[in-house]
From Swiss-Prot:
GO cellular component: membrane
Protein name: Uncharacterized protein YMR209C
Principal place of residence: membrane
InterPro entries assigned: CARME (IPR012901), S-AdoMet-bd_YMR209C_prd (IPR016853), SAM-dependent_MTases_sf (IPR029063)
Keyword Transmembrane helix: yes
GO molecular function, one term: S-adenosylmethionine-dependent methyltransferase activity
Membrane topology: Multi-pass membrane protein
SUPFAM superfamilies: S-adenosyl-L-methionine-dependent methyltransferases (SSF53335)
Additional observations: Present with 981 molecules/cell in log phase SD medium.
Pfam families: CARME
Record's subcellular location: Membrane
Length: 457
């Protein structure tokens, strides 16, 4: 009875408030402004919480940072914030709804055809194909659920002793259908389909991150990885490391690390050398941590939403295994999240630092900023090497677009000495695919620019 009375009173107050807001424009403007300020204040508070990598430990940037948080000094400023992390978790969680929504659009378009055409589509099994495609999307979504659950679990574990962030972390978990009990995640409704809550942001970056898990860790894509890794490893083995001498203090840095395949291979190949990998994309970085720590293989359907140039539907729907059981975290590997141009090592007494870049330099909006950031590492070592392999396919609104020859001459102007420079552009000898579907009617390949330079200025 009391509960019912209280509910009626609250309802009456809400009705009165809504009536006042409709009739009183100044009050309406004040109320909207007040709500916006509350939301803005909450957003600003979250913006002041930084995420340290690779632990995902949260820190208030306005408070002093304890000395044991050493990786903070590797990314000097513009450290990723909590909204950077949570916004991309939402992007991941929207994958199923957006994917099935697109298939629904294809279904509705086909239904616009006349009766004869629709009857022929039924005989072809076209609508059945779209339904089966939804099943493929759901299987990918289950992998994404594992990535989200892993990330939330890591966030909880790394901040379990920081009560100031407990409420915020509980809220983040609840948004994704979890609650925290005794320090562990419990899924509230496994069948819940996460709705589309953000109108901004493309799902192409989610598809790309999933596909990169295959490219970096599936045997299917070893044909793409091996030429890159073999060149880099060969240069380090034969032209950087002194024969039989591992007493030198050496650091390998891999900018634009993606989901971490190259950096993990280098850390495994050279277990006595520290490897720092840096990745700017939150989605790629989340998948990088997942790959290093999940310890189980996952099956991904990387072509499920690629309708063009397919020979048969089974090829579009086929799965690849990302062999994460063979990965495992390496003690000499530090995967960092942030802008490479804000990176600097902790130690200043390295004998050699080796920049290992693959499919990286053409991502620069400002090539000179990339070059300056690489050259700035010279003050941390006696000898600075740069081993690069990849095309020059410019994107991201570049300020300059150099030819290979111009880039070579620019290196010389800036004080680099090339130990080797070569091109692979002969299609008869094999070019390099990049997330290529080798069963498709469209297969893209790149020529490669390979160089190994030493900075002498």
């Amino acid at each position: 009875m009391v509960s019912s009375l209280a509910s009626n009173i609250i309802l009456a107050l809400v009705v009165v408030l809504m009536t006042l807001l409709r009739q009183n424009k100044p009050l309406q403007r004040w109320f909207v402004s007040y709500v916006e300020k509350l939301l803005s204040r909450k957003s600003n508070l979250a913006q002041k919480v930084s995420v340290l990598s690779p632990s995902l430990k949260l820190v208030d940037v306005e408070k002093s940072i304890s000395a044991d948080q050493s990786n903070l000094s590797k990314i000097n400023y513009q450290i990723p914030t909590l909204p950077d992390l949570t916004g991309n978790l939402i992007r991941l969680h929207e994958y199923r709804a957006r994917g099935e929504g697109y298939n629904g659009l294809l279904f509705r378009r086909a239904r616009q055809l006349n009766g004869i055409s629709e009857d022929q589509l039924q005989k072809l099994g076209y609508f059945t194909k779209l339904m089966k495609n939804n099943e493929g999307i759901r299987e990918n979504a289950r992998v994404i659920d594992k990535i989200i659950e892993f990330t939330l679990g890591k966030l909880i574990h790394s901040n379990e002793h920081d009560e100031e962030f407990t409420e915020e972390i509980e809220k983040i978990c609840a948004e994704h259908g979890y609650k925290i009990k005794d320090g562990h995640l419990i899924q509230l409704n496994p069948d819940f389909v996460f709705p589309i809550v953000s109108s901004r942001g493309s799902q192409s970056v989610v598809h790309e991150a999933l596909a990169h898990l295959c490219r970096d860790f599936s045997s299917y894509y070893s044909v793409e990885r091996d030429p890159l890794q073999n060149f880099i490893i060969s240069r380090i083995n034969h032209h950087v490391i002194s024969a039989g001498d591992m007493k030198e203090k050496i650091l390998i840095v891999t900018p634009g690390a993606g989901v971490g395949g190259l950096s993990h291979t280098l850390a495994t190949t050279f277990p006595k050398i520290q490897v720092d990998s840096i990745e700017l994309s939150a989605l790629m970085y989340i998948c990088n941590l997942f790959a290093l720590e999940y310890k189980h293989d996952v099956k991904i359907r990387p072509f499920v939403q690629q309708y063009s140039c397919q020979t048969v539907f089974d090829n579009q729907l086929r799965s690849l295994s990302a062999d994460l059981s063979k990965v495992g975290h390496r003690s000499n590997l530090d995967p960092l999240w942030g802008d490479f141009t804000r990176y600097s090592p902790i130690s200043k007494d390295y004998d050699k630092i080796i920049i290992c870049s693959a499919y990286f330099i053409d991502t620069a909006e400002n090539m000179f900023e990339y070059l300056s950031s690489i050259e700035a590492l010279k003050k941390y070592c006696k000898e600075l090497h740069w081993v690069n392999v990849g095309p020059l396919k410019y994107g991201t609104k570049p300020l300059v677009q150099f030819t290979g020859d111009e880039l070579s001459r620019l290196r010389k102007i800036r004080g680099w000495k090339d130990l080797v420079e070569e091109y692979e552009v002969d299609s008869s000898k094999g070019l390099n695919g990049y997330l290529t579907d080798y069963e498709s009617m469209y297969q893209g390949y790149y020529g490669l620019l390979k160089f190994h330079s030493v900075f002498e200025s």
